[in-house]
UniProtKB/Swiss-Prot annotation:
It comes from Escherichia coli (strain K12). GO terms for molecular function: DNA binding; sequence-specific DNA binding; tyrosine-based site-specific recombinase activity. The keyword Lipid metabolism does not apply. PANTHER family: PHAGE INTEGRASE-RELATED, TYPE 1 FIMBRIAE REGULATORY PROTEIN FIMB-RELATED. This is Type 1 fimbriae regulatory protein FimE. One of its GO terms (cellular component) is Holliday junction resolvase complex. It holds the Pfam family Phage_integrase. NCBIfam families: PRK09870.1 (NF007370), PRK09871.1 (NF007371). The keyword Oxidoreductase does not apply. Residues 2-184 form the Tyr recombinase domain. SUPFAM superfamilies: DNA breaking-rejoining enzymes (SSF56349).
Amino acid sequence: MSKRRYLTGKEVQAMMQAVCYGATGARDYCLILLAYRHGMRISELLDLHYQDLDLNEGRINIRRLKNGFSTVHPLRFDEREAVERWTQERANWKGADRTDAIFISRRGSRLSRQQAYRIIRDAGIEAGTVTQTHPHMLRHACGYELAERGADTRLIQDYLGHRNIRHTVRYTASNAARFAGLWERNNLINEKLKREEV
């Protein structure tokens, strides 16, 4: 077996719990939640601005990079709550009014890739994940979780903004659950055919 290169849903939950009580807990929780739920690359996440969100309608506009398809995703209730909680806290941060970027540092500038990497790595350590955690693992965790929930490859491709389905197949190809019941279904078909022959 090769070393796992993604996080499980339980590990992501543990990471969010690990960060939520720290000094920057509201920001870090929101950052991890949105990265995971929307399968965002770190650059896409850090490029999010308030104009990309419609909290009333429950939508988030994701501008995909690497020639990916930009998409509009629904924002679930817990995501809206996390954004609202972070936005309230963010308003008290020095220099927060200088930028529309959602994720900022304590100094009021847009959060850097290095800072986001450190937040996610440290959350993984605190949560006791089985592998060293980095931001792209949250994107992979999203793809694998969607496959586990039975989403088909094309839908996952659209959701993650992949232009080429080759990049998406990894999520469904390794999902053993998709084969569950395959023989049972085939046996039912065979039994039906036998009855029709009689």
